[in-house]
């Protein structure tokens, strides 16, 4: 489940010395960047460009935090169904969240000030429309796109989707042709990355992520 936080975790490990032993529950920072502009889109609404947030990719979770508001979210990797990058034009990292576990974040977004697109909460109203699907897209305009994307690849591989893994085994045993479009790390295989590594998904055109990437589940 996505967790709302009012401060960044204080026990984050930002540097690991050679030979240092770590406990399984310790949270290692693989990527960190402050003042990241972002955009949010649900299945029904697209919000304006948001103000700056702190982004952390750790061994345990994907963290978005607004230091001005002392408010943020710890997002488990199991809720991330797709991540990709665009390296041309205006570079960004794209993250797609899906599933019932993201409901707290979706409900919170309904209280955003839509006129400014910030993380400031606006008073709730009785006639607010509910989201029809637990689906959310994040576009993060990080400075170092490659490092952020690689960190996401690494950390998400530490938290494999058990349900998807079971489906992959079943698809392979049944000869399902759709299994040919996934690699073992659950990355989308396209014409752009078929001859490259599993973590080489990217947007290199101005096309919308929704148009360029198609889900098959």
Swiss-Prot record:
It comes from Schizosaccharomyces pombe (strain 972 / ATCC 24843) (Fission yeast). One of its GO terms (cellular component) is pICln-Sm protein complex. The keyword Zinc does not apply. Interacts with smd1; the interaction is direct. Interacts with smd3; the interaction is direct. It is found in: Nucleus; Cytoplasm. This is Splicing factor saf5. The lineage of its organism: Eukaryota, Fungi, Dikarya, Ascomycota, Taphrinomycotina. InterPro entries: ICln/Lot5/Saf5, PH-like_dom_sf. Chaperone that regulates the assembly of spliceosomal U1, U2, U4 and U5 small nuclear ribonucleoproteins (snRNPs), the building blocks of the spliceosome, and thereby plays an important role in the splicing of cellular pre-mRNAs. Most spliceosomal snRNPs contain a common set of Sm proteins smb1, smd1, smd2, smd3, sme1, smf1 and smg1 that assemble in a heptameric protein ring on the Sm site of the small nuclear RNA to form the core snRNP. Belongs to the pICln (TC 1.A.47) family.
């Amino acid at each position: 489940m996505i967790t709302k936080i009012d401060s960044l975790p204080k026990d984050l490990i930002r540097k690991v010395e050679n030979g240092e032993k770590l406990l399984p529950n310790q949270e290692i920072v693989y990527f960190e960047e402050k003042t990241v502009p972002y955009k949010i889109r649900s299945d029904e609404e697209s919000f304006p460009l948001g103000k700056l947030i702190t982004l952390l990719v750790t061994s345990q979770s994907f963290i978005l935090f607004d230091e001005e508001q002392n408010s943020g979210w710890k997002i488990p990797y199991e809720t991330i169904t797709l991540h990709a990058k665009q390296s041309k034009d205006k570079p960004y990292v794209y993250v797609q969240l899906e599933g019932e576990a993201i409901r707290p974040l979706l409900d919170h977004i309904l209280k955003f000030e839509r006129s400014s697109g910030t993380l400031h909460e606006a008073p709730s109203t009785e006639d607010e429309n509910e989201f029809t699907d637990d689906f959310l897209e994040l576009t993060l305009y990080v400075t170092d796109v490659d490092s952020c994307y690689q960190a996401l690849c690494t950390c998400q591989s530490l938290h494999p989707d058990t349900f998807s893994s079971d489906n992959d085994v079943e698809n392979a045993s049944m000869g399902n042709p759709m299994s040919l479009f996934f690699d073992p790390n659950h990355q989308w295989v396209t014409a752009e990355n078929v001859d490259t590594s599993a973590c080489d998904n990217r947007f290199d055109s101005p096309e919308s992520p929704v148009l360029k990437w198609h889900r098959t589940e």
